[in-house]
């Protein structure tokens, strides 16, 4: 029987560290439920000591998720570890993931600790974590740039203290496949008690090699856990992509010889959910989940695929969750048909009132758009959830615009502030600029617009536009997403969504970063 590769997803922790990717508690819960449906082995739900918001999200997820192990990150100190244990209490089974830097650069410049102090701190941290659970993971931060002899000493010591998973972190994406794979291999060979722990890999994509390095850690090094995120989400250039790891190991089982517990048909739904919640659009040529991943433009390729799919396709689109039947509903579709499609898409709404509200939005969209696609339905539910969690301090009501060739466009927008309607009017260099200016005449947020992007959710001129707006204020960066067949209205909704996140803090109260 083949060994099993453990999939450890850190979308909710490391992925969320992408600038603008902060998620509300409700959004984290929706992603956690989707990860559970995908049968992810371990879900790192956050960093409990970083903020009250993260603690609350972890605590709630720990009580809801039953089929995946829930994990919280903690620095190598008693306060962080106690906070993680408290957040994880509702879980049937949980993991504490503690870490400390081990590279000379980090020990000297960041920690200002000697190697012996770091060694002792690592031992104490694992010993304390074992008081709460027998599932303890230890990561040597910046492990790929650490001294080999010292790294071996630290890892041997923490395994002796009870660490059951050892995670070799390529924190800055410095590794290359052969060297990183051999690093993991050497550690497993040199550490006398290495057989007492599962070795794990955690790679960043700064040089574009996160997936390659992770696979080398598995094949060459013998690692049996990969830490990854949906869509490769993460700060800087991102993290190891879950979908690429899973499909590489599944498609090339002849080479890797490993089993997986993942339901791969849930990969694309997870990708779309994370993209629409965070506003980080998946590039069309992204492996596995990109819109063009299974598209064939070459006539020779098309002819081959029509004759036999395996001539040019090494995996089937339906195996990762792409559906051939795109048009699902129209304005004559009833509530039961809508509810059934939600279930087929793996979308779970918590109450009848939420279902009724989503169905109302669906009917409103169907009156304006003849064909409703899966992506439209996901967008409806995602936007509904975001508005509910944002408490709608600001709420879009209506928009009118006037534009003639040679004249500056004028916009008039009606929106509510804590339930009281206000009207903003302004001119701009285009209809979108005029609309956002009109909002600011009443809000005066003082924020800076860092990003404005438009993406068509589906195909055709009737497609809904999905607009992502990224705002910065006082060091905080937030994303807002809005959808509407009218691009200008979608822009207004996205801007208001971002303002709500700035106002609410997006569940982040004095957050602290954690780099592994």
UniProtKB/Swiss-Prot annotation:
User: Per UniProt, which keywords does this protein have?
Assistant: Amino-acid biosynthesis, Branched-chain amino acid biosynthesis, Cytoplasm, Leucine biosynthesis, Manganese, Metal-binding, Transferase
Domain of life assignment: Bacteria
Xref: CDD domains = DRE_TIM_IPMS
Q: In which pathway does it act?
A: Amino-acid biosynthesis; L-leucine biosynthesis; L-leucine from 3-methyl-2-oxobutanoate: step 1/4
Q: Any idea which positions bind Mn(2+)? A: 14, 202, 204, 239
An example Gene Ontology molecular-function term: manganese ion binding
Domain Pyruvate carboxyltransferase residues, every copy: 5-268
- Broad enzyme group: transferase
User: Where in the cell does this protein reside?
Assistant: Cytoplasm
Concerning InterPro entries, the annotation shows: 2-IPM_HCS-like (IPR050073), 2-isopropylmalate_synth_dimer (IPR013709), AIPM/Hcit_synth_CS (IPR002034), Aldolase_TIM (IPR013785), LeuA/HCS_post-cat (IPR054691), LeuA_allosteric_dom_sf (IPR036230), LeuA_bact_synth (IPR005671), PYR_CT (IPR000891)
| Catalyses which reaction(s) | 3-methyl-2-oxobutanoate + acetyl-CoA + H2O = (2S)-2-isopropylmalate + CoA + H(+)
Q: What does this protein do?
A: Catalyzes the condensation of the acetyl group of acetyl-CoA with 3-methyl-2-oxobutanoate (2-ketoisovalerate) to form 3-carboxy-3-hydroxy-4-methylpentanoate (2-isopropylmalate).
The protein, known as: 2-isopropylmalate synthase
Give the source species.
Answer: Paraburkholderia phymatum (strain DSM 17167 / CIP 108236 / LMG 21445 / STM815)
Print the organism lineage. Answer: Bacteria, Pseudomonadati, Pseudomonadota, Betaproteobacteria, Burkholderiales
Q: Gene name? A: leuA
